Amino acid sequence: MMSVVHPEIVGTPEPLGAASWLWADENQTQQFAQALAQQLELRDAYVELQGDLGAGKTTFVRHLLKALGVEGRIKSPTYAVVEPHEARLSPSLAPPTPSLASMSPQILNIWHFDFYRFNDPQEFEEAGFRELFASPGLKIAEWPEQARGMLPIADLKLAIRVNEQEGRFVICETHTPKGLAILLGLLKLSPALANSQAAHHAATKT
């Protein structure tokens, strides 16, 4: 049997870029998700979502998956840990990287993880989660801190916080060149707060 060699999981590096947004309501959450869904590099990326209970992580994921083309009811993976999805893409939105050559050009595989109740490191191996993270497609994880040390470096980290007006303050950090490409494309469609753009430019000048 051929063995699969996975990248060594190391500590999180310094961000390559960062930006922040304010979602005043769910409509703006949906608009942000639609802008993110248009980034081709997202189709083979790993995204972490951080935030307290009720911050809106699962709501955002539902908007993102619908924007990517997932149809039907989108269940939360809280009890199952992971929910797989398939999105049908038009040929112009086919995954751009050679590593996705084995996938149908019109099907995007998506795995939505929720590690809130995860407490057994052995399950990570036995359930095949490591293989899923090494597979082509989009991986999204809520409560990644519950599986810290077992997960790869995230391309994007989105921290969602409830603000005083019941909107959402969102900070996005990128930790890989792929994540930076996604962020740069996202900023063209969904301008960030002015102070975060300055922080982003400062972070990406090196």
Specify the residue positions occupied by each region the protein language model found.
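Hydrophobic anchor at the beta1->P-loop junction of P-loop NTPases
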Residues: V47-L49
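Short phosphate-coordinating micro-motif centered on Lys-Gly-acidic
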Residues: M2-E14, A19, N119-E125, R130-T206
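Conserved lysine of the Walker
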Residues: K57
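Intrinsic disorder/low-complexity segments
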Residues: A94-I107, A202
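Phosphate-binding P-loop
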Residues: Q38-D44
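P-loop (Walker A) phosphate-binding loop of NTP-binding proteins
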Residues: D52
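Short beta-strand-centered segment that lines the nucleotide-binding/catalytic pocket of NTP-utilizing
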Residues: V70-H85
